[in-house]
Structures are given as structure tokens and as C-alpha cells.
């Protein structure tokens, strides 16, 4: 069953950056139901596998949390190997009837790797070490790329400033920003 546009809880920006052997992942806090903001301080970032990984989610909240739980199971099964766990989750996502109906995306970072698991079950590893998902993702991505290219800011600062830029532009992104680092 597809979520109707009015009943879908959506609207977020999650961005992760790798720089100098460190990773940061951050998100805004806005949750929207249809055209109404229902919460300003939603936590969309989770620390995983004994604090070695960070995961953020966008999309239908219940769907995203289901995927996050499945991803954690895969991490445990594959001893924290990020890429292997992501590929196995994507494989399940594509073949399982129930999972295929989930409308969510995950952005995952470690100190060495940044991945997106898309809503179609694809695993994407961006070449520039920047992952961005959600309604304000393209604004945050553009800001992060410019900051990576033209400043010496560390990963957490880039994430923070990129989210501020997205919040200034995207109506579904607010400035209640949470950034975590590994």
C-alpha cells in the first residue's frame, strides 16, 4: 500500500561528509504530515555498531525505522562490515515483497566510507564522500561540495553549515540541527 501524499510523514534533510579520516552525519529536526509541521526536534540520526557507524533516515518514519532495524541486523551478522551489510540489506529489499513497499532511504557513514541505500534498494557510494537524502538534500549537497572545495572546515562543520543552507531554502527543513561524528 502506497502512502498518500497527505498522510506521509516526510520532509527532512540528512547529510554526511567524510574528510581527513573523520565522518559526520547530521539532520534537521522537522517532521511534516502533509502540509503541516508536527514536530520540530525529531532525531533522525542513530549511532550503530558500538558507535563506529552513523545512520540517518528520510522518508516514511515507520518504514525508515524498519529498514534501520534490518540494517542493524545485517551489521551484526557481518561483523560491522558496512558495505557487505548494505549490499545484503539491498538484496533483501529488492526480493522481499514487504520490504519493497517501504518508502525510505538511509544515509550511512563510517570514518572510511559513506553510503546511501536508496528507496529502490540500490547501494550508492558517492565519489566525493558526501551523502545526502531527503527533501533538502540537493541544497545541502551543493553547499557541502562548495565548502569541501573552498574551505578547511572539518566534516562536522561542513555538515552543520550545509544543513543551515538547506534550512534557509527548503520549506521542509528546519534549523534544529543535530550533527554527530565518528
From Swiss-Prot:
Cell location: Cytoplasm
Molecular-function GO term, any one: metal ion binding
Xref: PANTHER family: ATP-DEPENDENT PROTEASE SUBUNIT HSLV (PTHR32194:SF0), METALLOPROTEASE TLDD (PTHR32194)
GO cellular component terms listed in the entry, alphabetical order: HslUV protease complex; proteasome core complex
A Pfam family reported for this protein in Swiss-Prot or TrEMBL: Proteasome
Annotated InterPro entries: ATP-dep_Prtase_HsIV_su, Ntn_hydrolases_N, Proteasome_sua/b, Proteasome_suB-type
Keywords on record: Allosteric enzyme, Cytoplasm, Hydrolase, Metal-binding, Protease, Sodium, Threonine protease
Reactions mediated catalytically: ATP-dependent cleavage of peptide bonds with broad specificity
Source species taxonomy: Bacteria, Pseudomonadati, Chlorobiota, Chlorobiia, Chlorobiales
Protein name per Swiss-Prot or TrEMBL: ATP-dependent protease subunit HslV
Catalytic residues, chain numbering: 12
HAMAP family recorded: HslV (MF_00248)
Subunit-level organization: A double ring-shaped homohexamer of HslV is capped on each side by a ring-shaped HslU homohexamer. The assembly of the HslU/HslV complex is dependent on binding of ATP.
UniProt keyword annotation of Cytoplasm present: yes
Biological role: Protease subunit of a proteasome-like degradation complex believed to be a general protein degrading machinery.
NCBIfam families on file: ATP_dep_HslV (TIGR03692), PRK05456.1 (NF003964)
Activity regulation comment: Allosterically activated by HslU binding.
SS bond list: none
Top-rank taxon, per record: Bacteria
Residues reported to bind Na(+): 167, 170, 173
EC number: 3.4.25.2
BP term (GO), one: proteolysis involved in protein catabolic process
Family statement drawn from the similarity comment of this UniProt entry: Belongs to the peptidase T1B family. HslV subfamily.
Keyword Plastid attached: no
Amino acid at each position: 500500500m502506497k502512502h498518500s501524499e497527505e498522510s506521509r510523514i516526510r520532509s527532512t534533510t540528512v547529510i554526511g561528509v567524510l574528510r581527513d579520516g573523520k565522518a559526520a552525519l547530521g539532520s534537521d529536526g522537522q517532521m511534516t504530515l502533509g502540509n503541516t509541521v508536527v514536530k520540530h526536534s525529531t532525531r533522525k540520526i542513530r549511532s550503530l555498531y558500538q558507535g563506529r557507524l552513523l545512520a540517518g533516515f528520510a522518508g516514511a518514519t515507520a518504514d525508515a525505522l524498519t529498514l534501520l532495524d534490518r540494517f542493524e541486523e545485517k551489521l551484526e551478522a557481518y561483523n560491522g562490515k558496512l558495505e557487505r551489510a548494505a549490499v545484503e540489506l539491498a538484496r533483501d529489499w529488492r526480493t522481499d515483497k514487504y520490504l519493497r513497499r517501504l518508502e525510505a532511504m538511509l544515509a550511512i557513514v563510517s570514518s572510511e566510507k559513506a553510503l546511501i541505500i536508496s528507496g529502490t534498494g540500490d547501494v550508492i557510494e558517492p565519489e566525493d564522500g558526501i551523502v545526502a537524502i531527503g527533501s533538502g538534500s540537493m541544497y545541502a549537497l551543493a553547499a557541502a561540495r562548495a565548502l569541501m572545495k573552498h574551505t578547511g572546515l572539518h566534516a562536522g562543520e561542513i555538515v552543520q553549515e550545509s544543513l543551515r543552507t538547506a534550512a534557509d531554502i527548503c520549506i521542509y527543513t528546519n534549523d534544529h540541527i543535530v550533527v554527530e561524528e565518528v
